[in-house]
Regions:
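Polar low-complexity intrinsically disordered regions enriched in Ser/Thr and small residues
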Residues: 18-19, 23, 29, 100-101, ...
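Acidic pyrophosphate-coordinating catalytic loop
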Residues: 145-149
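A broad, low-specificity signal for short, low-complexity segments enriched in glycine/proline
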Residues: 35-39, 50-55, 116, 151, ...
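Electropositive, surface-exposed helix/loop patches at the edges of structured domains
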Residues: 112-123, 172, 179-180, 208-211
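Feature captures outer-membrane beta-barrel proteins of Gram-negative bacteria and organelles
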Residues: 37-39, 60-71, 86-104, 119-136, ...
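Cleavable N-terminal export/targeting peptides
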Residues: 1-42, 221
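Transmembrane beta-strand segments that form the barrel wall of outer-membrane beta-barrel proteins
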Residues: 44-54, 64-66, 70-82, 89, ...
Length: 221
């Protein structure tokens, strides 16, 4: 009988120790980042956009862009951007910060192929404060076939958004996809958004008798 009591006491003691270890391990797990934060960092986000160019005395064309982002990683593909019938593929690193003055910056490196062939360091960046937004993207194409084809591309916007779904402002562009008398084209823009869709109209060189029109549509998913 005394032997059974001894065995029973030993079992109770072991169970108590095991239970104590289980409780002690609980708070350790709560110190790790919540699964939702980790999942957010691992999520992919995508966007697709198409810009239709209506150029006086020149060929009209569509310029599509597709992006994919996951945490710091930025991937992008463009067509008819650096030149007509020319594509480019990009790899970039996302940075962001700020609260009232929020900023994003993505340095990138791309390969260009088609009518123009080369490599291109580039960037995308934005600043937003109150209802104002500044966006700019640029690249310097190093033409591996002909160094005279080296060129600096840029697209920049300064906008005001009086309400969440409406923005308007100024735009500038420097491109070789089509030729004009102006090295840097200047214009006006107005854009609308609905949920994950956006639509924007641009008028470049509005002081000319026949300005260049650009109609853009985009989607995020």
């Amino acid at each position: 009988m005394r032997a059974m009591q001894t065995v029973f006491a030993a079992l109770v003691l072991c169970a108590g120790q095991a239970f104590g270890q289980t409780i002690a391990e609980g708070p350790v797990a709560t110190n790790s980042p919540p699964p939702t934060i980790e999942n957010e960092a691992r999520k992919w986000s995508f966007s697709a956009a198409a810009m239709g160019y209506l150029v006086p005395d020149s060929r009209d064309y569509v310029q599509p862009t597709i992006t994919a982002d996951r945490g710091w990683l930025h991937l992008e593909a463009r067509y008819n951007y650096e030149n007509l019938e020319t594509g480019s593929a990009w790899l970039g690193y996302n940075f962001s910060g700020g609260n009232k003055l929020a900023w994003e910056f993505t340095p990138m490196l791309g390969g260009v192929f088609g009518h123009t062939t080369g490599i291109a360091p580039g960037y995308k960046g934005s600043l937003s404060w109150w209802k104002l937004g500044l966006y700019s993207e640029g690249e310097y194409v190093l033409d591996t076939g002909d160094s005279s084809g080296n060129f600096l591309y840029n697209w920049s916007e300064l906008t005001l958004a009086p309400v969440e779904w409406l923005r308007f402002g100024l735009v500038t562009q420097r491109t070789r996809a089509y030729q004009t008398d102006r090295d840097v084209q200047r214009g006006l823009l107005v854009g609308f958004s609905y949920k994950k869709l956006s639509f924007t109209a641009y008028v470049f060189n509005p002081d000319e008798s026949r300005p260049t029109l650009v109609l853009a549509a985009g989607m995020q998913f």
